[in-house]
Amino acid sequence: ARMRRVVAHVRGQLDGEEQAAFDRAHAAWLTFRDRHALFIAQSYARGPIRALIQAVTLESLTSAWTAELETQLGVPHD
């Protein structure tokens, strides 16, 4: 929810090519996040811990990206 609010705020400040560039960068980041979390989870043996590791990694990466957007692009914190 926090990331959606931050992304919406950022997109609202951009127009035209800037918004398109942000959308491309954000889409690439989402792909990286998902693939990285899967990679990390695959390093664990099959079993229930694997899904947990993937979820925790997704949450951690999302939190870090959201904080980066807030800091670098001047988004007000909640």
Please give the residue ranges for each predicted region:
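N-terminal alpha-helical modules
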Residues: 1-78
